[in-house]
């Protein structure tokens, strides 16, 4: 039996913005001082906690567990109503009864990554040594750190081997890291719209966002929790800039074009005359109500540092040498954040390492965010891969 606890109150922003800590809807695994998380930066993080959601039930031989890894600003609420926003889970296109990740067949786990702000320990959590929010005293974390923490959670749940690890964007990075760090614990891996290392362009976009946050006078060098302020403007601008990279020119043209917002003529001012301006402002303002600015700094930095080949003398294929994991790599034609060329590099490395891998490039103009949207071909590919992996690993037809 897994010992879990409801999320207890952690540090909240001075303006009493809603946090997962205020809505104890997740389970939490607590790890004490005797179970530290060794971070790549050399720090042992302890105590710490991981907030997570589960859907479905673990079968008798514990062979039907799927770990879903969320993206940069995602969280553990993959298929339930979000306790803060009241919106449906972020991957309802894939997770749910009759869908590819069916809780009537699989035991689905999704945890909030270390460093985030939806219940897992991060910079907005209380530093046990000071009794105050960590802020920038929180240690730098990496994608491998996130995966090590997830592995500790999977151990706590009593699961030796995962049937599948699946994720898109930063979640895809975690998926690939799982397959490298714990190859015997991952039967299959579905890596979507991602790469094995962040490009210079993506690092540049992240630096733009971080500088926007840090330039906000309300940031207070990360100590805004204690100052009774919050860097709304900086984080909002960071989100607006990032959101553009998740879309495509065709999608923006189709959705907005040059149409005016509630007017026929320009105001000859700096108001949001165009619909696309109003849309971006909404994206920025709604984001700051659910996400912590320091967490944004930490998680973007974790993505920037990610480079699987770096630990294998720069030879990516060596990271996957003789792996027994079955892979499916998916890209989207209009994704310019993680273009198909990067997915092909992953596939080539997997092939060179002797891995079993299938690859799909999906034609769509919906940009990077296509993996979060209802794209029928994508849904069909995920379903087919899980079915074939289930047959290969003796899971087909098994109940709970």
Swiss-Prot record:
Enzyme class: transferase
Keyword Amino-acid biosynthesis listed: yes
Alphabetized Pfam families for the sequence: Abhydrolase_1 (PF00561)
One Gene Ontology molecular-function label: homoserine O-acetyltransferase activity
Biased composition (Polar residues): 1-11
Signal peptide: none
This protein's UniProt keywords: Acyltransferase, Amino-acid biosynthesis, Cytoplasm, Methionine biosynthesis, Transferase
EC number: 2.3.1.31
Disulfide bonds: none
Annotated positions binding substrate: 239, 369
Associated pathway: Amino-acid biosynthesis; L-methionine biosynthesis via de novo pathway; O-acetyl-L-homoserine from L-homoserine: step 1/1
Gene Ontology BP annotations: homoserine metabolic process; methionine biosynthetic process
Family designation: Belongs to the AB hydrolase superfamily. MetX family.
Function (record text): Transfers an acetyl group from acetyl-CoA to L-homoserine, forming acetyl-L-homoserine.
Name this polypeptide is given: Homoserine O-acetyltransferase
Record lineage: Bacteria, Pseudomonadati, Pseudomonadota, Alphaproteobacteria, Hyphomicrobiales
Gene giving rise to this polypeptide: metXA
């Amino acid at each position: 039996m897994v010992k879990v606890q409801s999320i207890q109150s952690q540090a909240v922003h001075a303006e009493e913005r809603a946090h997962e800590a205020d809505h104890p809807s997740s389970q939490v695994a607590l790890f004490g001082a005797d179970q530290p998380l060794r971070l790549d930066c050399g720090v042992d993080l302890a105590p710490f906690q991981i907030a997570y959601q589960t859907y479905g039930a673990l079968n008798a031989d514990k062979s039907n567990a799927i770990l879903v890894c969320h993206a940069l600003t995602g969280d553990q609420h993959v298929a339930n109503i979000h306790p803060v926003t009241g919106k449906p889970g972020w991957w309802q296109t894939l997770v749910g009864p009759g869908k590819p990740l069916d809780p009537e067949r699989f035991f689905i786990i999704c945890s909030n990554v270390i460093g985030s702000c939806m219940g897992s320990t991060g910079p907005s959590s209380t530093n046990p040594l000071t009794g105050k929010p960590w802020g920038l005293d929180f240690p730098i974390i990496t994608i491998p750190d996130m995966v090590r923490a997830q592995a500790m959670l999977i151990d706590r749940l009593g699961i030796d081997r995962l049937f599948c690890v699946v994720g898109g964007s930063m979640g895809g990075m975690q998926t690939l890291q799982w397959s490298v760090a714990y190859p015997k614990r991952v039967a299959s891996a579905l890596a979507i719209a991602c790469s094995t290392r962040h490009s210079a362009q993506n690092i540049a976009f992240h630096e733009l966002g971080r500088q926007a946050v840090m330039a906000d006078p309300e940031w207070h060098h990360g100590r805004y929790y204690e100052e009774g302020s919050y860097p709304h403007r900086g984080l909002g601008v960071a989100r607006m800039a990032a959101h553009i990279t998740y879309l495509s020119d065709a999608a923006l043209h189709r959705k907005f074009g040059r149409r005016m917002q509630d007017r026929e003529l320009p105001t000859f001012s700096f108001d949001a005359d165009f619909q696309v301006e109003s849309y971006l402002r909404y994206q920025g303002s709604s984001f700051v109500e659910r996400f912590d600015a320091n967490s944004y700094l930490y998680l973007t930095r974790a993505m920037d540092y990610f480079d699987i080949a770096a630990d294998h003398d720069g030879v990516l294929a060596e990271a996957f040498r003789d792996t027994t994991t079955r892979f499916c790599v998916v890209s989207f034609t209009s994704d310019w954040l993680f273009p198909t060329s990067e997915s092909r590099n992953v596939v080539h490395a997997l092939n060179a390492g002797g891995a079993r891998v299938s690859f799909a490039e999906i034609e769509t103009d919906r940009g990077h965010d296509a993996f979060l949207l209802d794209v029928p071909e994508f849904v069909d590919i995920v379903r087919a891969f899980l079915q074939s992996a289930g047959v290969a690993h003796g899971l087909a037809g098994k109940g709970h």
